[in-house]
Regions:
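Surface-exposed amphipathic alpha-helical segments
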Residues: 24-34, 124-153
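Amphipathic alpha-helical segments
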Residues: 21-35, 67-79
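A short acidic-to-branched-hydrophobic micro-motif
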Residues: 43-71, 121-127
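Short, solvent-exposed coil/turn segments at beta-strand boundaries
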Residues: 28-31, 47-51, 90-92, 113-121
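Hydrophobic h-region of N-terminal signal peptides that target proteins for export
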Residues: 6-17
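Positively charged n-region of N-terminal signal peptides that target proteins for export
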Residues: 1-4
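Signature of long, low-cysteine stretches enriched in small and polar/charged residues
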Residues: 78-117
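Short, surface-exposed coil-to-beta transition loops
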Residues: 38-42, 53, 103-111, 120-121
Length: 153
């Protein structure tokens, strides 16, 4: 009996620490997002519409030395072979890498420079058929970051 109770407490302890407390999972699911990975330091979710595929990673990383830029560089160097790197830029809110796939679609990697939560880093993969120019891309980045940040408590 003691082992059963201990096991239940251990399981509840693991479950309660699995997702970052600052992510509103109920709101995510209400807005048709699917939770892909739910761990203490990595939380991934995404959704696909007719025009856009969106995957978001929220990372809890204790290091602060320009981590957002490092994450952006990692995305660039770790991209799949079928994704051809096109360009890189940054605006006030994010580092953005642009890739073109063999099928003609475009993938935009968006890494937020700062978030309202300490040690929280947001990385977004935005896939679309559209080839955004700089001004258009800035609007997409702002809109997407605003939406993702709305799921943070």
């Amino acid at each position: 009996m003691k082992k059963i109770i201990l096991t239940i407490f251990l399981i509840l302890g693991v479950v309660s620490f699995a997702a970052p407390k600052y992510v509103d999972k109920v709101k995510l699911q209400k807005n048709s997002y699917q939770i892909i990975q739910d761990e203490a330091d990595v939380f991934l979710f995404g959704k696909s519409t007719e025009d856009v595929g969106l995957t978001v990673g929220i990372y809890n990383i204790q290091e602060n030395n320009d981590m957002a830029k490092k994450i952006s560089e990692e995305v660039k160097t770790g991209a799949p072979a079928e994704q051809k790197f096109v360009s890189s830029r940054e605006n006030k809110r994010a580092y953005v890498n642009k890739f073109k796939a063999n099928d003609g679609s475009y993938t935009y990697s968006i890494v937020a420079k700062k978030t309202k939560i300490k040690n929280c880093y947001i990385s977004i993969i935005y896939i679309t058929a559209k080839d955004f120019k700089d001004n258009e891309l800035d609007k997409v980045v702002d809109k997407t970051l605003n939406e993702v940040e709305s799921y943070l408590k």
